[in-house]
C-alpha cells in the first residue's frame, strides 16, 4: 500500500527538496500541488515520478480537490511573495488558513507545516519578524483546529544555499565571493547572540537534508506529533564557518561582527532582507535561541536524516546531515 503525500510549494526550495526525497520511497506517492504545472520545476518533478496537480492556494475548492485521498501533506508558503506588500491585499495567514482548512476538509491525517518561531512571544514584544510571526500564527490555527491525527511544525534554519547567491554577497561583506581591500573574504554580520549567549548558528542544507528530515517525520508521524522540529544540518559559529571555508579553499577569510548591535547592519533598503536584519535583533534578544524558547539542537534532525537514509538503503556515509565544510567543498573547492 502506498500513501499519498501532497506537497504544497513543491516547486520551491523546501517543497522541491521534500518531493525529491519522498519519490525515492515506494511506500509514498508524491502529489506536487502548484499554480504552474507547466513550469520547468513542475516538469522536473513529473519526470522524477511525482504527480503534478494544478491548484491555487487562495481557492479553497481547488485545494480541497487537490488534497483528496492524501494521507499526509507538507505545506510551505512563500513569505517573499510581493503580494503580501500590497496595501489592502491578502495576508500570508489568509493563504495558510485556506490551505489548512482544505487539507482538513479532505481528511488529510498527517500535516507537516513549515513554520517559524514565536518571535513576539519570545522577545516580550520587542521583535516582530512578520514572516515568521505569520507562519507561527498559521501553525497555531492548525493546532487549534484539531482535525489532524498528527501535526508537526518544522522551523528551517539559515540556508547554506544562501551563500551561492553571489549578488547579495556584498551586503554581507563580500564573503564568499569578493575580497575586501585587504584581500580577505570578509563575512560581516552582527553577532548571533552576543556575550553570554549561544553563538552557534543553525545552518541547513536545504537540498541535501531538508527533504530527508521531512521524509523521516512521515515515516513515523506519531512520534513527532506536536513537536517543533529544528530544521538544521549543523550548529556552527560564524568564526568557525569562515574557518571551514578557508581550510577548504585556501583563501584568506575572516569574520567581522557588525557593532555595536544588529541595528548597525545595513541592508541597503532591500525589503526581502528586512526580516534578516530583524533575525539578528531576535537572536540577540533571546541569547541565540532561534527555533523556540528551548536551546537549538541538531540531534533530532540528524536522527530523522538517518532514519530516511536507512529506509532508502543508503550507505553509512550518506546517513549524516551536511557539514558546512562539506558544503563549501562541494561548491567552492577547486579540487573536489
From Swiss-Prot:
Purpose: NmrA-like family domain-containing oxidoreductase; part of the gene cluster that mediates the biosynthesis of the alkaloid (-)-FR901483, a potent immunosuppressant that shows efficacy in animal models and a probable inhibitor of purine nucleotide biosynthesis by targeting phosphoribosylpyrophosphate amidotransferase (PPAT). Within the pathway, FrzB catalyzes the reduction of 4-{[(2S,5S)-5-[(4-hydroxyphenyl)methyl]-2,5-dihydropyrazin-2-yl]methyl}phenol to produce the (S,S)-dityrosyl-piperazine intermediate.
Keyword Chaperone found: no
Lineage start: Eukaryota, Fungi, Dikarya, Ascomycota, Pezizomycotina
One GO CC term on file: nucleus
Protein name: NmrA-like family domain-containing oxidoreductase FrzB
Amino-acid positions noted as binding NADP(+) in the UniProt annotation, renumbered to this chain: 135
Organism: Cladobotryum sp
Gene3D superfamilies, per database record: NAD(P)-binding Rossmann-like Domain, UDP-galactose 4-epimerase, domain 1
Pathway: Secondary metabolite biosynthesis
Sorted UniProt keywords: NADP, Oxidoreductase
Catalytic activity: 4-{[(2S,5S)-5-[(4-hydroxyphenyl)methyl]-2,5-dihydropyrazin-2-yl]methyl}phenol + 2 NADPH + 2 H(+) = (S,S)-2,5-di-(p-hydroxybenzyl)piperazine + 2 NADP(+)
Family as reported in the entry's similarity comment: Belongs to the NmrA-type oxidoreductase family.
